[in-house]
Amino acid sequence: MPLRSSQSSPPASQSFKRKQPTISSFFTKKPPTSQEKAQEPEDEPAASRRQFANALDKATRVKEHGAPAERDEEQEEEEEDIVAPAPKRIKTNGVHEKEPASAAKEVSSASRPAPPLASSQRTELYKFASSPADGAGAGVDRPEDPETKQRQAERERLHQLFVKKLGGADCAVGIGRSAGGDAPSGAEEAAEGDEDEEVAPAPAAKGRGSKKAGGGKLTPLEKQVIEIKRKHMDTVLVIEVGYKYRFFGEDARIAAKELSIVCIPGKMRFDEHPSEAHLDRFASASIPVHRLHVHVKRLVAAGYKVGVVRQLETAALKAAGDNRNAPFSRKLTNLYTKGTYVDDVEGLEGPTPAASGGASPATGYLLCITETNAKGWGNDERVHVGIVAVQPNTGDIIYDDFEDGFMRSEVETRLLHIAPCELVIVGELSKATEKLVQHLSGSKLNTFGDKVRVERVGKKKTAVAESHSHVANFYASKLKAASVDDTQTSNLLQKVLTLPEQVTVCLSAMIEHMTEYGLEHIFQLTKYFQHFSSRSHMLLNANTLVSLEIYQNQTDHSTKGSLFWTLDRTQTRFGQRLLRKWVGRPLLDKSRLEERVNAVEELKNPEKTVQVERLKRLLGRIKSDLEKNLIRIYYGKCTRPELLTVLQTLQTIAQEYADVKSPEDNGFASPVLGEAVASLPTILKDVVAFLNKINMHAARSDDKYEFFRESEETDEISEHKLGIASVEHELEEHRAVAAGILKWPKVVYVTSSGIEYLIEVENTSNAIKRVPASWVKVSGTKKLSRFHTPEVIQLLRQRDQHKEALAAACDKAFAALLAEIAVNYQLFRDCVQALATLDCLLSLAAIASQPGYVKPEYTDHTCICVEQGRHPMVEQLLLDSYVPNDTDLDTDQTRALLVTGPNMGGKSSYVRQVALIAIMGQIGSYVPARSAKLGMLDAVFTRMGAFDNMLAGESTFMVELSETADILKQATPRSLVILDELGRGTSTHDGVAIAQAVLDYMVRTIRSLTLFITHYQHLSNMTQSFPDHELRNVHMRFTESGAGQDEEITFLYEVGEGVAHRSYGLNVARLANLPAPLLDVAKLKSAELEEQIRRRRLARLLTAVGEVMSDPAKGDEDFLERLMSTAEQL
């Protein structure tokens, strides 16, 4: 009970009483001096003083930090009494206002004045230099107190009572707790109360039995959070608490940073670290329930692993259960990373970027990689690598097993092709591979235009045996079921079980990894296992993808200006993904290639306009990503409106061609088109059967209770619906009972602020006097009051329990429906794949319809014969017309071109144009040319550009030669090789020697089709060593005008025969706006060097002519050819 002053002197002013504790609370406790210790009363026990000081300290902290903003006058009065000035407290001798009568009488009978005190008990503990009380009694000796032992004992007892009452409900701490809000005791408010009691930012020492000074007792929610967090320390946890999702500790800091939300300060760690002992709660941040997936997507896109912890109980069912007084049960129900986020049909991609030339669309692959050191070391090092890549959004699985050299070009090629958003590394990687992975997944944006998330998994010495056992057990049940009636599935499963060792290790790790996210079912789709290195496709290595700008341009790494951007005219997301695969994996099978290009030709044919427009209209009506929708149904993560949309879309597709019974009935001559169209109506029967179970309007509005048609509802759903109807009927009958009690026949139920079945009674009517005391007043106004009767409260509780059970039954039935649809996943997926094929073919047909595109002619002979060919991307980006050029390469005739010409003359664009036309042709597309005859190339290799590899400690020239060495090892007579200015990274003599040796090896030994760009005019003499013209000199044509200072160069961008003997680098320097004086000096130096070289050549020519004149026997045919060549150079 609060202390009251019993003195006769006038009380201190209200302002003084309030300022005193506030000022002193800002200063730490000052230890008493020896003089002060001597002045302390000897008759008061030291334990009592310490308890009194601790109690005052707690009260002061509560007033500073924990007192609510709004307090009534009584609360303020009580707190003011607690912290009243000490001199006035001394005169009361520490006696409560409501003391026993004897004590009060004893105090009142004491007529002598209290002796003056140098410092009271409070000012002795909290000194403030400017306090008038401190100086009032300074230097005054306190006389001995003549109190009796009985009075001392009574005083001690009263101090103990005060300390005990400080933590009671009616003290300042209790007032702060009640104002802050305690947990509601009603069952209906359990969810809200759990949040208020456990999570609200409580000040120190707030709450009964939960003194958290120095990290004391934890609330039940905090215990739950710590228990879950310790099992998932690498995960950002989003925890459902009442009607919000909350972050705690370090997770709250991350959420505040990434989501731009408020973080309430507190503990960041979960290990009770001493550095946070002064904090009494965890840092926290919160988001609304309906915005969960919006914020989860942002965290996942930022590279975090996010876990969602949900409440497994509802308020109504918890109130009716046996654990109504325990906290809500919570469990980690969902885990998400960039590669495993499938809970939103759009995933992390957002709108289609390719159409606007934005960033390259993410493939969404998770790639698992492991390696062992095969043999060798240094530059001869060979490693054995296994990979498994999974795309959870579509169900595709890619695997490969290969050896790689010290440059790791094979690993880089696969990483660039697959473009994973997440890597799982099994075991330790070699330094070279580790550096490559770091380069592609570093903190900065990588070549994919995104950050790659990396997880590492340990690898035991017995990993191979354990992995094989794990994979075998995973597929055991499926293999047993398939062996009876499905030979194809059995063969596919046997193929999976006989994968190479490194692939099996990766597959086992990926199964375990995906199980953590509940997506392990994807590996049961064995039909979609694909080998990366299938020889049915052209090989485009990492350098080729970058140099030829297959997926991204080299300027800003967006899709605009890439080959994929040029060919992409698709209308659907799944069609766009398939086209991306086509672009990166051109065909090698001539028959398949001819089928595809014939299909494009038929779609381009004006006679097929009706059929083509019908297909375009059908694709235009597909607004959802069916491939992702189907895999979400397979995972059981599809929503009700989404399921309705998918089934209705599939029904539209099937009904459009319901009249097609066979591939010959669809109006297309091409077998590719015929089979694709004929597969569309095969799903109609199943789709209609599923749609007949669904209430369309309820599904569209996401009404789980009416989702199924009445005839399709389960017994459990019907039972709870009848229970709800019964309760509502009883509520209606009870209205008449309430009317009889009030003797007012017009009683009706009303709903106010979401609270149903309220009985309104006017405050001025006679009925208000007849309201029983058992009725609960819920709300009211000046004119009326609203009540719940005890019967209504009980019936509403029963109805809520039925509603909760009904919701669970509806979710269970919906999950069963999704599982039933998932049985037909492969049938539906094949239909969507057929539609994607049609979309890609229509896209290629749109390209073929552009002016200047021609259908290529394919031959088994290795050659590239193009007349008036053009660069496909530059042509679309340029406003002016592109200058076409001819190309004639044949493995039996001229198989190499030595390309020279001035800087900026178009050499690199020309060789890229040749490579891109060859790739487009093997994709099955028309090519930008007047005519084209193409052989089946097995690979395109490029060595272009100049850059170093600082991570690997390799110089520009080292990188250049290492890439060249890889090309020489991999190239075949059916490959196209492009080498751009090889040897420029070293001295002229060494560069010429290396370039000449490599070119000779390519032409004579490997016999690949080769385009070799150089500024070394000396290499042009190599053509003389190839009498059958296997190597030819060509140059980029230009015209010169003016002389000296006024010399100008005009680039014609045409390929001509012969050699360009000058590079005209000074022209580029002038275009780059180098200072004029610098250009003048450069021109003089260039002229001097050219004159020196010309004089040397002339001197050698004159010497040779003199020798011939003196000895005619030396003038053989070879000598005369060299003589003529020297004269031409002059």
Curated annotation (Swiss-Prot):
Principal location class = nucleus
For bias type Polar residues, the affected ranges are 21-36
Q: Where in the cell is it found?
A: Nucleus
Per UniProt, which keywords does this protein have? ATP-binding, DNA damage, DNA repair, DNA-binding, Nucleotide-binding, Nucleus
Task: Please indicate which superkingdom the organism of origin belongs to.
Answer: Eukaryota
Q: Which InterPro entries match?
A: DNA_mismatch_repair_MutS-lik_N (IPR007695), DNA_mismatch_repair_MutS/MSH (IPR017261), DNA_mismatch_repair_MutS_C (IPR000432), DNA_mismatch_repair_MutS_core (IPR007696), DNA_mismatch_repair_MutS_N (IPR016151), DNA_mismatch_repair_MutS_sf (IPR036187), DNA_mmatch_repair_MutS_con_dom (IPR007860), MutS (IPR045076)
Q: Which GO terms describe its molecular function?
A: ATP binding; ATP-dependent DNA damage sensor activity; mismatched DNA binding
Check the record and name the Pfam families matching this protein.
MutS_I, MutS_II, MutS_III, MutS_V
User: Where is composition skewed (Low complexity) in this entry?
Assistant: 1-15, 108-120
Q: Name one GO cellular component term.
A: nucleus
At which positions is ATP bound?
A: G901, P902, N903, M904, G905, G906, K907, S908
Tell me the segments the record calls region Disordered: 1-153, 177-217
Which Gene Ontology BP annotations are present? mismatch repair; mitotic recombination
Ranges for the region named Mispair-binding domain are: 212-339
Known SUPFAM superfamilies for this protein?
DNA repair protein MutS, domain I (SSF55271), DNA repair protein MutS, domain III (SSF48334), P-loop containing nucleoside triphosphate hydrolases (SSF52540)
Which segments show compositional bias classed as Acidic residues?
Answer: 71-82, 189-199
Composition bias, Basic and acidic residues: 58-70, 141-153
The family line of this record is: Belongs to the DNA mismatch repair MutS family. MSH3 subfamily.
Q: Which PANTHER family would you find in this protein's record?
A: DNA MISMATCH REPAIR PROTEIN MSH3, DNA MISMATCH REPAIR PROTEIN MUTS FAMILY MEMBER
Q: What does this protein do?
A: Component of the post-replicative DNA mismatch repair system (MMR). Heterodimerizes with msh2 to form MutS beta, which binds to DNA mismatches thereby initiating DNA repair. Msh3 provides substrate-binding and substrate specificity to the complex. When bound, the MutS beta heterodimer bends the DNA helix and shields approximately 20 base pairs. Acts mainly to repair insertion-deletion loops (IDLs) from 2 to 13 nucleotides in size, but can also repair base-base and single insertion-deletion mismatches that occur during replication.
Its quaternary organisation is: Heterodimer consisting of msh2-msh3 (MutS beta). Forms a ternary complex with MutL alpha (mlh1-pms1).
Query: What's the protein name?
Result: DNA mismatch repair protein msh3
The organism encoding this protein is Aspergillus clavatus (strain ATCC 1007 / CBS 513.65 / DSM 816 / NCTC 3887 / NRRL 1 / QM 1276 / 107)
